[in-house]
């Protein structure tokens, strides 16, 4: 079961999604992201599809290549999904899509979202996704700078 992780920083949604999928804490995922040069100690920082894929791999997951997404119905597998693209800033919000026999649900790391599982797909406009296939069997945790 994947547990929702709430982002601790205003722009930490990608880090929170990586933490959810890997079963680690936000703090541990953020420290790794800082070590990889993806994030900084203080926001704002933004995770691109490439950065997020790297972080997912370093956390022991096997992301496949990111792709554009325009309809939730076309998603069939566990994925990190970019939603609600802002044309002015060229930014989006990362969430985790979990497929089920009933169509799936979204785990949203945004603190103001109170429900653990979102199914209000009409309020979330997908723009891209990174399918996450399966755990990497040869995974060895990356050493961190400090305590996790």
PLM feature spans:
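Active-site nucleophile-adjacent alpha helix/oxyanion-hole segment immediately C-terminal to the catalytic cysteine
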Residues: 1-43, 54, 58-59, 140-148
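Conserved active-site-adjacent core of cysteine acyl-enzyme catalytic domains
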Residues: 24, 34-134
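Compact, aliphatic and Gly/Pro-tolerant "microcore" segments centered on a short helix or tight beta-hairpin
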Residues: 126-148
């Amino acid at each position: 079961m994947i547990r929702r992780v709430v982002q601790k920083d205003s722009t930490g949604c990608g880090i929170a999604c990586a933490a959810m999928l890997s079963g680690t804490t936000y703090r541990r995922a953020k420290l790794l992201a800082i070590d990889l040069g993806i994030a900084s100690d203080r926001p704002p920082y933004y995770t691109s599809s490439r950065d997020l894929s790297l972080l997912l791999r370093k956390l022991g997951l096997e992301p496949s290549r990111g792709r554009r997404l325009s309809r939730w119905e076309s998603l069939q597998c566990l994925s990190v999904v970019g939603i609600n693209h802002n044309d002015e800033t060229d930014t989006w919000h990362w969430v985790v899509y979990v497929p089920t026999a009933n169509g799936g649900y979204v785990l949203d790391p945004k603190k103001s979202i109170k429900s653990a599982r979102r199914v209000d797909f009409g309020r979330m406009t997908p723009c891209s996704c990174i399918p996450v296939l399966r755990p990497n069997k040869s995974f060895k945790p990356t050493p961190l700078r400090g305590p996790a």
